[in-house]
Amino acid sequence: MSSFVLRPARVEDIPVLGSIERAADERFRATGHTSFLDGETIPLDVAQRAVEAGRITVAEVDGEVVGWLLVTRLGAELCLGQVSVLPSHGRLGIGTALLRDSITRARAAGERTLVLNTQSDVAWNMPWYARHGFVVVPPEEWSPEMRAVTEAQREHGIDWNLRIHMRLTLA
């Protein structure tokens, strides 16, 4: 396999983002977290706006997009919205490169924090983010926006008994 390159997503990349997300989410089948397997992916209009705003970075191998990362805002904080890598290209450092790139760009932009929500019991979720400096945000420290995300995800069927918010302090 050739090496990968990271670049800002382009409009022509949008159609493959959902299929990459669905393929990556298949890993959850073995964990019992089947709510991620409902087939729902980033809506096309959301992807369009994110691409136009420069908020999606893709990883490309031999001209094929094999992974992507989305950053959004959660109130005053930058939020890691999605990281997806095709399983056929997993464990090659692509996800780590996407994450490190987002951290570097956030710092360069003067962001103070980067937050996310993830599963606490899945090896490629909470422990992976912790290795990159993210720490669990205790519920009593959740922002109103974190509480709103939690409630919206619960309403969508996501079990928050094993889900957490995490934060990386950048500045």
Please state what every model-predicted region is:
Residues 116-125, 142-147:
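Conserved beta-strand-loop-alpha-helix junction that forms the acyl-donor binding cleft
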Residues 85, 91-104, 131:
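Conserved acetyl-CoA-binding loop-helix of GNAT-fold acetyltransferases
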Residues 130-138:
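Conserved acetyl-CoA-binding loop of GNAT-fold acetyltransferases
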